[in-house]
């Protein structure tokens, strides 16, 4: 299991309570979704339409309609799946679909004001999941201005319009600001106090101080051309580890698997405030689920969440979030986004630095990682711990320990509660995209705005004494079969033992220091050993005789602490997952 100062049980992130009962949708009243009217103040230079399934594609009347159900006359077809690189000049890239201006213009900026905005709107009742992009562009060669607009269903190219304004900046601003007002009912100059208006678009808050992946690739290409490119001073095993956890492309692929739309809100660009707003929406969804409100209130809460955190469901209707499990999955998504925000900022390279980029990334972690020899005592004990606590119910894969790193996080040793007894070396697992955040910031507790019912024993740092329980939270696959597991020294002190999940477990401590969820199987104390002052609960697991007379019994133990100072990261394992053949 793993834990982060904010993550889930048994090793990954948020853990959902067991729930088998799904609830039906309630009926909701329709919203007025009449398309906005449009005026032109400048000459239209170019207005290209995407092919539509029947009927004439009139921009002024279809820009708010093409997002609906598949098969309607105004549903746009996707004509290309080609990936286009972003060319970044200034603080925001020109939309790659604006072929007339890519490489020839840049997004206009005035100080910290970037005339680039992505709007989003989701309405489950009408199967709306749409975006509206507006950019004010300035030509590179001369002071000619234009306004680029593109709109459609999330994940689709949609329709677009390019309005030329020659050298008249004021007219270009007027068009940009009016379109923003039309779509949001907010004034552009007051966007710092933006308020979502029902039936209108929301504004995605972007961080323009963060480099995009494409800018980083450009920097890497430039650095490779330098004849003075320094060699890395890191051990080769550490170099490979840093490459693994700082792989932005892999992060993007992982987020796409979770249905997050990386084109509308590129990784590293979504602000902390936007992610926090996503948590607040999930809290509303949690309130609806707990109150049994499965009609209009739940639908509006889901609309708000998908509007704030863009998802790509293709032409399918965005699903209602109706169960604790579905809520937990969205909490995991936001936690991953938060970690990726940290990672994107950390991997920004300094071209003029005397260090190799990998050395820069490693230094920015503020976390020492020392490879251990495979013949060392620590390696042998931990390898035995890994294999002997592989749970019998997790039989679809085996694990091979590739490398072991001793971890020394800046400040953790000094802050650690050594005064507490009952210190154990316990497991925590997490997605590959989360490790930069974990190693640079430590294991963290979920933020206050996160729903509490997404966590089995409340908002704490979760650990396991069974390796595979935590390994499941690595979400490895046959194609991506490398994962990382963390072993932390956890000062458990006196445990409050529970037979079943309770999201309010922290409030039940009554002077105790941690929560322990009791499982049916666990390592026997007869096999325990001590490593550097911590108890290592070696397996194999045996029947504990634990039975919950009132309901479901946990399969394996859960350990939860609610204070990061009770955790000290000690070892990081690089593991290969060997999945069994299906036939």
Curated annotation (Swiss-Prot):
Result, substituting residue 128 to A: Does not affect poly [ADP-ribose] polymerase activity
Effect of residue 394 to A: Strongly reduced serine ADP-ribosylation, caused by abolished interaction with HPF1
EC number in record: 2.4.2.30, 2.4.2.-
GO cellular component, one term: site of DNA damage
Domain of life, source organism: Eukaryota
Residue numbers spanned by region Disordered: 1-77
Effect of substituting residue 558 to A: Abolished poly [ADP-ribose] polymerase activity without affecting localization to DNA damage sites
Major subcellular site: nucleus
Description of how activity is regulated: ADP-ribosyltransferase activity is regulated via an allosteric activation mechanism. In absence of activation signal, PARP2 is autoinhibited by the PARP alpha-helical domain (also named HD region), which prevents effective NAD(+)-binding. Activity is highly stimulated by signals, which unfold the PARP alpha-helical domain, relieving autoinhibition. Poly-ADP-ribosyltransferase activity is tightly regulated and PARP2 is removed from damaged chromatin following initial poly-ADP-ribosylation of chromatin to avoid prolonged residence (trapping) that has cytotoxic consequences.
Tissue: Widely expressed, mainly in actively dividing tissues. The highest levels are in the brain, heart, pancreas, skeletal muscle and testis; also detected in kidney, liver, lung, placenta, ovary and spleen; levels are low in leukocytes, colon, small intestine, prostate and thymus.
A Pfam family assignment: WGR
Reactions catalysed, as given in the entry: NAD(+) + (ADP-D-ribosyl)n-acceptor = nicotinamide + (ADP-D-ribosyl)n+1-acceptor + H(+); L-seryl-[protein] + NAD(+) = O-(ADP-D-ribosyl)-L-seryl-[protein] + nicotinamide + H(+); L-aspartyl-[protein] + NAD(+) = 4-O-(ADP-D-ribosyl)-L-aspartyl-[protein] + nicotinamide; L-glutamyl-[protein] + NAD(+) = 5-O-(ADP-D-ribosyl)-L-glutamyl-[protein] + nicotinamide
Feature: compositional bias, Basic and acidic residues: 57-67
Keyword annotations: Acetylation, ADP-ribosylation, Allosteric enzyme, Chromosome, DNA damage, DNA repair, DNA-binding, Glycosyltransferase, NAD, Nucleotidyltransferase, Nucleus, Phosphoprotein, Transferase
Active site: 558 (for poly [adp-ribose] polymerase activity)
Modified residues (Phosphoserine): 226, 232
Residue ranges of every copy of the PARP catalytic domain listed in the record: 356-583
Record note on quaternary structure: Component of a base excision repair (BER) complex, containing at least XRCC1, PARP1, POLB and LRIG3. Homo- and heterodimer with PARP1. Interacts (via the PARP catalytic domain) with HPF1. Interacts with core nucleosomes.
Function: Poly-ADP-ribosyltransferase that mediates poly-ADP-ribosylation of proteins and plays a key role in DNA repair. Mediates glutamate, aspartate or serine ADP-ribosylation of proteins: the ADP-D-ribosyl group of NAD(+) is transferred to the acceptor carboxyl group of target residues and further ADP-ribosyl groups are transferred to the 2'-position of the terminal adenosine moiety, building up a polymer with an average chain length of 20-30 units. Serine ADP-ribosylation of proteins constitutes the primary form of ADP-ribosylation of proteins in response to DNA damage.
Stated name of the protein: Poly [ADP-ribose] polymerase 2
